[in-house]
Amino acid sequence: MKKALVAVMCSAMVLGAAGCGTSGNEVKTGEISNVEIAEKDVNLFVKDGTLTNTGATFILANNSDKDIQYDEPYRIEVKENGEWHKIDVEVAFIQPLYTLKPNETAVLEIGWENGYGKLPDGAYRLVKTVNYDDVENYESFDVAAEFTIG
């Protein structure tokens, strides 16, 4: 069933990875984010030495005792006056579904220039939604990696 679901999602929801984003080095700040980052055994962080204003390599680590699932979409938020704000941008993603086993990591090469443009100096976080792969106890939550440009 899971394989069929993945196949359907991959073939039916291919939207492309390009979006309508910002141009130049500006960030169009939106409303205050209501995302709550879960304190779970699943973590997201920037791999040392990979951060630029157009992308980075992120590590998604599953330190839990359960399989987790994740997909391509992410969002970037900017910190202003001590609060996280959404960045007004529309980005389309392909929709494959990945599974990460307990105590495994995944390397995520993320280039955001097509959607978010070149990020100016500031504090940001990349947010991804993941869920435990448990049909009886479905639980979806957000993980984030904070980073600073400049």
What feature does the model see in each segment?
Residues 91-117:
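Intrinsically disordered, low-complexity Pro/Gly/Ser/Thr-rich segments with frequent PxxP/GP/PP motifs
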Residues 1-4, 8-9:
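Positively charged n-region of N-terminal signal peptides that target proteins for export
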Residues 16-19:
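C-terminal motif of bacterial Sec signal peptides marking the signal peptidase cleavage site
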Residues 119-129:
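A short tyrosine-centered beta-strand micro-motif
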Residues 8-10, 32, 125:
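N-terminal functional modules and adjacent low-complexity/disordered segments of proteins
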Residues 21-94, 99-101, 129-150:
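Primarily secretory-pathway and cell-envelope proteins
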